[in-house]
C-alpha cells in the first residue's frame, strides 16, 4: 500500500539555453534562456495555470530562475533560489564548448568519458560531490512541505542526482535518466516514502497530451 499522500513535487529542467547549439559545459556559468527556452516555460505556465502550488524553487542561476518566473507569474509566486541547487561545477571548463575543451585541455575529454561520474575538471566537482551538495537541500525543501504541492526548476545533472537518489540508482548509472530541456518529472511522497510517478520528455509537453494531463493531476 502506498499510504497517505504527502508532498508532491513537479521537478523541471530549465528551458533551452542561449548557447545550446554549441553543446557547452555551462555548470555555474550563468547563461540565459534562448527564445525557444522562454517559449517552453511560457507554454508550461499556460498548462499549469489551473493548478495550485504552495511554493516555487530554483537554483540561483538565471536559466532556472527565469524558467521558474514564467510559472511564478501565473501562480503569483516568486522563485525561492538556492545556490545548492546549481548544476555540477565544471571548473576551468565553465562556459566552454566541447571543441574548445578538446583544444585547450588535450586528452581531458577522453579521460572524462572513461568515468563521467568521477571525473573532475580542474576547480570543478564530481557527481558524488554534486550529490552531497544537492540532496540535503532537496530533503530540506521536502520537509518544509509535508502536505503541499510544489515546483522545483533545476538542472539536468541536479535532476538526475535527485531521481537517482530516490530510485537508489548508483551514481555512475544516473546518465540513463533522460532530461531534455524543459522536461517534467513528478515525485509523490506517501507517508514520507517517495514514488517517482513520471519522468518527462520535452517533446511531450502539449495541452493536448493526455500523458501530461495525467502526470500533473
Language-model features: where?
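Loop-to-helix element that buttresses phosphate recognition and phosphoryl-transfer chemistry
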Residues: 13-70, 121-135
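Phosphate-coordination/substrate-recognition cap region in phosphate-metabolizing enzymes
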Residues: 2-4, 43-109
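Acidic, low-complexity terminal tails and accessory targeting/binding regions
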Residues: 1-8, 88-103, 143-148, 165-217
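General small-molecule cofactor/ligand-binding pocket signal
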Residues: 10, 80-82, 197
